[in-house]
Amino acid sequence: MAATGNEEQTLLPDIEEEAEGMEREMESEDDEEEGMGVEHSEEEDEEDTSEDERENEAEIQRLEEQLSINAFDYNCHVDLIKLLRQEGKLHRLRKARQKMSELFPLTEEIWLDWLKDEIRITEDESDREKVYELFERAIKDYVCPEIWLEYVQYSIGGMGAQGGIERVRSIFERALTAVGLHMTKGASIWEAYREFEIVILSTVQPPPGTVPSQEQQELLSAQLERIHTLFRRQLAVPLMDMEGTYAEYSDWADDGVPETVTHQYRRALQQMEKGKPYEEALLVSEPPKLAEYQSYIDFEIKEGDPARVQIIFERALAENCLVPDLWIKYTTYLDRQLKIKDLVLSAHERAVRNCPWTMGLWKSYLLALERHGADHQTVKDVFEKALNAGFIQATDYVEIWQSYLDYLRRRVDFSKEWSRELDELRAAFSRSLEYLKQDVEERFSESGDLSCTLMQIWARIEALHCKNMQKARELWDSIMTKGNAKYANMWLEYYNLERSYGDAAHCRKALHRAVQCTSDYPEHVCDVLLNFERVEGSLEDWDAAVQKTETKLNRVCEQRARVAEKEALHARQEEEKAEQRRKVKADKKAQKKGQKANRTGDKRKAEDDDEEEWGEEAELPSKRLRGEDDFDSTVTEELMETESGLFGRRAPPARKTEPPGFRKNQQGAPEPQRQPHDMPKEQRKDENCVFVSNLTFNMEDPEGKLRTLFQGCGTIQQVRPVFTAKGTFRGYCYVQFEDRLAVPEALKMDRQEVDGRPMYVSPCVDKNKNPDFKVFKYKTSMEKHKIFISGLPYSATKETLEDLCKEHGTIRAIRIVTNRSGKSKGLAYVEFEDEAQASQAVLKMDGTMLENFTLSVAISNPPGRRMKDEAAPSRFLGAAMPRQLQGARGKGRTQISLLPRSLYRQSTPDAKAENGTISAPHATVTDGETSLDTQTKSLSNEDFARMLLKK
């Protein structure tokens, strides 16, 4: 210690001179900045009333007002800080940064800007201490080599103060511990440390030609040993450009590099070569590089060096701070492997600051606090913060309450009849039930604890530890009144509690109530009651139990028989409807074949045969169900000419003007005109073909245009556009490839805009051969990694949404919902890399404004789509009738119904509504006749006659 003091006294004059020189340089820079500031302030005074300043001030006030409403708006904080820094409002800028740092961990860029601004205005030693405190806060958020390098460089500027050199060395050592193992950036800290010590060495060396004293020689030897030690330590760490460091040490060391150092260097070099592929993968990949970091982490865990595992985790989290799974993996590793209190608790605290919506991180934090002996108030404060974190599921609140109650239970000494900890535990149980009932149900419309898990545990604690069966029974009575009395497992749980800690009378009472109320597994409950009476009961108890169970089981059998009868009736009705549909379809097919036989000419016949084989009419219904797009209610005349039953039966053939290109043969029939590239039917393969639809009807040369569009997918055998008899393009076609491998590439062009409309591309499948084939490619269930945005301006584009959402995470896909004409509906789906990013986007974007439109953002959970047979019933019987009533061109024929008007009305005035409609009996049409299907039987002509006579 004395040597250290003498060293500082010897070095102080030289250090003070260097410090004074640095201060003079800083003062000159400050003078220049002040001069620039004066000129700038004069310009500001001259342009004080400029429009830009007024706009900026108005924007600042708007941002501050928005933050007063929602303090957790991250983007608003960033915009406010950027604007205040631009305007040079230092006092307000400092307050804005301080407020943001209290709510969020700050990024490396924000911290560096803040630190540089504070360093620039530092004037005296007290201000330097404030900057030191700011650095200490900055290094706690993330492990950033740049911030550590800025920290050590700033500390060098204060080494002239009392104890300054030791302070600099202390900060350097902490920096090496934090980032010295960083394979690509750690070398900068090592080199800065060595350069600092070499500068110190130059100050302790005696002037040339003088004989150093013993004290000077000791100082010189100690300083040389420090530099040797730094070289040896660095060469033992796998870092990039190790060869250069080794060569530098070889030149610097007078006696050469020791063998032990060379051995450590070679071993570190081998380790560096193992990790080099992972570093190169990180170098060439795009942020946030999560997959590459995951591979790197797995490699380091397999290698088994805890320090290197820690640094790679920290590097990954610096770029993926909003990935809860990565934080969970890191904290779990620290809990199970390192178990260092300060390191573990710091990681848990940073985890919940970055991902506060993740319940699992809060739960792990509470366990870590208890594991490392944190005081009760600290655990309680962390739990209260967790309740205000804003979880996305009701069950998350149940789990965090469960973890906290477990902690409180472990604090209680149940050997005492009364304790303050026991009262606190009971109060916490009561508060948890109240919290779930009020706060959670108000937000999620459910408590999240349908099985009353918390109450069950409370009852078991009262029975087991407190010997208070009366309280346990009260709790179970409350559990059963919350809709759990029909479940056998709930009654058996209560029975087991009474069996363990109660008496036989209450066991018998519980089982009798269970037999009376259970509806899911009554046989099991009855068996438990009979077995109980075999062991515990008298003859009278046995007779009562047998009578009760027989009565219950007989009633259950009757109920099941009625249900089975209803199901059988429903199955028969469905089978009859299916048979009727098959019959109607067969009649239509026969009628269609008859129409074909009566047609004159071979050309029309060939065209119809081609269309039937390619399955175009079978494809159209599936295309109608694509995407979230609604089908236009007004169907164009061209689409209504389809020959299948999609939009109605084809109208009877009428005389038509023959389109251009038709010429009759000697018998008067038109000659067929095959397309130039049309191929025989037997050569067509559906697996090599795609169906293209929703094209504009006035497309010129559709074959040539589509051939150009799809030529990049593979070699095209044929493009077959479909035309009406008049020669009008129907808006859909088939593209046949030579190789089936081209089909997936063609399907990727689905929804591509062509002539202002989204082009639909789907597999070519014959629905007659594959009736269950579904074209709808988007999920109709909840997708937690995808968000649904409504309320968008119709002018919003994919680029607009990408700019809006990219700051919340990695975007995988953006889909704007459009109608068939390609116009936006103001709805969009944005798919993120993971659930955490989507949840963060919902929290940050919901309720924000875009071009004066208020956005509504939620997790994607589209409603299930109804199939044809599941369509909601209409208000009137006519709406449920087959489409043959509308004819080939919609409602071209008369709409007069021959059904009596009294039967055409709704069945009952109080019929239940479903999705905005009222159920009514189904009407069916067979061969032009309408009949009414009721739940009892169909009405005959005699029934209609009797009904008319009653009037």
UniProtKB/Swiss-Prot annotation:
UniProt-annotated stretches for the region Necessary and sufficient for U6 snRNA binding: 517-941
PROSITE patterns: RRM
Subcellular location: Nucleus, Nucleoplasm; Nucleus, Cajal body; Nucleus speckle; Cytoplasm
Coiled-coil region(s): 533-593
Knocked-out gene: effects: The egy mutant embryos that lack detectable sart3 expression display microcephaly, microphthalmia and die by 7 to 8 dpf. Pharyngeal arch formation is defective resulting in a thymus devoid of lymphocytes and exocrine pancreas development is also impaired.
HAT repeats: 88-120, 126-157, 163-199, 222-255, 304-336, 339-371, 374-410, 467-500
Pfam family, one: RRM_1
Region: Disordered, residue numbers: 1-58, 567-686, 905-938
Sequence ranges of Basic and acidic residues compositional bias: 567-581, 674-686
GO biological process, one term: exocrine pancreas development
GO cellular component, one term: nucleoplasm
GO molecular function: histone binding; U6 snRNA binding
Keyword annotations of the record: Coiled coil, Cytoplasm, mRNA processing, mRNA splicing, Nucleus, Repeat, RNA-binding
Biased composition annotated in UniProt, kind: Basic residues: 582-596
SUPFAM superfamilies from the UniProt entry: RNA-binding domain, RBD (SSF54928), TPR-like (SSF48452)
Domain RRM: start-end pairs: 688-766, 785-862
UniProt biased composition (Acidic residues): 14-56, 608-619
Biased composition (Polar residues): 927-938
Function: U6 snRNP-binding protein that functions as a recycling factor of the splicing machinery. Promotes the initial reassembly of U4 and U6 snRNPs following their ejection from the spliceosome during its maturation. May also function as a substrate targeting factor for deubiquitinases and mediate the deubiquitination of components of the spliceosome and histones.
Listed name of the protein: Spliceosome associated factor 3, U4/U6 recycling protein
